[in-house]
């Protein structure tokens, strides 16, 4: 199964909000060159909430075609409507995704049994490796370790992206589930410690702008080389912090625009990063070697 630095890829857009297919192709090729280990297409960072069905499928299809034979692709196919999630997951399998990432249902706040039945229904409907995604800070819905344990026994539910940043939570899941159940961090700030504690990788926002260094940090942590991992992570920590100075993916898209890698487009209800926040992130990017010092 997939290990290492998995970029939660942005969906590049033009100023009018339309998908920028040329920039998308360039980003995928850049991640191959930079040593990224895998790509998540149309996750939260990819603005899944504001892409229509056809756009959602088209972005996944394009990323799969571009990455084929070079990088595994995990398709974001979660929804708070079980039938919608099944449809998106079926489409991703048809289009050749290697696995799917399924966020917990947001807004409708299902109980733990509802979460279990939701993910079980998707797994039974579509035979593709499926990764659970727990991010209660965004969804107001927390997938508890005992429910993860139950779901880990479903053959094609193969792992979880745990984005609480709670390392004790990660350790509990590790203890409850079999060794082949994959644990991915969804919190860049704690990802190094997460991997050193037995995790298998990081589904990363920071990897959008510093892919080579994120890949190297994850490789060192996976190899148990804590000193190298800590040294690399110390260089990345300012990005881990300031790429969340406003709601994700607002800062990371602005950073990529400053690097000349994408246009400035983002879809409502998100808006471009405020002018007040720009100097701080720009200075952090300069300190991290992402921009020329002027």
Swiss-Prot record:
Keywords: Amino-acid biosynthesis, Cytoplasm, Diaminopimelate biosynthesis, Lyase, Lysine biosynthesis, Schiff base. It catalyses: L-aspartate 4-semialdehyde + pyruvate = (2S,4S)-4-hydroxy-2,3,4,5-tetrahydrodipicolinate + H2O + H(+). One of its GO terms (biological process) is diaminopimelate biosynthetic process. Its main location: cytoplasm. The record marks 44, 107 as: Part of a proton relay during catalysis. SUPFAM superfamilies: Aldolase. It comes from the Bacteria. InterPro entries: Aldolase_TIM, DapA, DapA-like, Schiff_base-form_aldolases_AS, Schiff_base-form_aldolases_CS. Pathway: Amino-acid biosynthesis; L-lysine biosynthesis via DAP pathway; (S)-tetrahydrodipicolinate from L-aspartate: step 3/4. PROSITE patterns: DHDPS_1, DHDPS_2. One of its GO terms (molecular function) is 4-hydroxy-tetrahydrodipicolinate synthase activity. Pfam families: DHDPS. The keyword Cytoplasm applies. CDD domains: DHDPS (cd00950). It is found in: Cytoplasm. Homotetramer; dimer of dimers. This is 4-hydroxy-tetrahydrodipicolinate synthase. The lineage of its organism: Bacteria, Pseudomonadati, Pseudomonadota, Gammaproteobacteria, Oceanospirillales.
């Amino acid at each position: 199964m997939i290990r290492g630095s998995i970029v939660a890829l942005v969906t590049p857009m033009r100023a009018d909000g339309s998908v920028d297919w040329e920039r998308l192709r360039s980003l995928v090729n850049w991640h191959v060159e930079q040593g990224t280990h895998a790509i998540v297409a149309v996750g939260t960072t990819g603005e899944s909430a504001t892409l229509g069905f056809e756009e959602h499928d088209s972005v996944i299809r394009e990323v799969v075609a571009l990455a084929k034979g070079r990088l595994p692709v995990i398709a974001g196919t979660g929804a708070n409507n079980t039938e919608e999630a099944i449809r998106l997951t079926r489409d991703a399998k048809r289009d050749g995704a290697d696995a799917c990432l399924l966020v917990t249902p947001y807004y409708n706040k299902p109980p733990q049994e509802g979460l279990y039945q939701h993910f079980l229904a998707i797994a039974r409907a579509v035979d593709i490796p499926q990764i659970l995604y727990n991010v209660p800070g965004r969804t107001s819905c927390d997938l508890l370790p005992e429910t993860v344990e139950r779901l880990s026994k479903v053959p094609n539910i193969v792992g979880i992206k745990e984005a609480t940043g709670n390392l004790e939570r990660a350790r509990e899941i590790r203890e409850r589930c079999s060794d082949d159940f994959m644990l991915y961090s969804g919190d860049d700030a704690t990802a190094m410690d997460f991997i050193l504690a037995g995790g298998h990788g990081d589904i990363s926002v920071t990897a959008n702008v510093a892919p080579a260094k994120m890949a190297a940090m994850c490789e060192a942590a996976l190899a148990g080389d804590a000193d190298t991992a800590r040294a690399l992570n110390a260089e990345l920590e300012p990005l881990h912090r300031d790429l969340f100075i406003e709601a994700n993916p607002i800062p990371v898209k602005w950073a990529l625009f400053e690097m000349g890698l994408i246009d400035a487009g983002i879809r409502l209800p998100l808006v471009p990063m405020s002018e007040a926040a720009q100097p701080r992130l720009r200075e952090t990017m300069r300190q991290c070697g992402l921009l020329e010092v002027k």
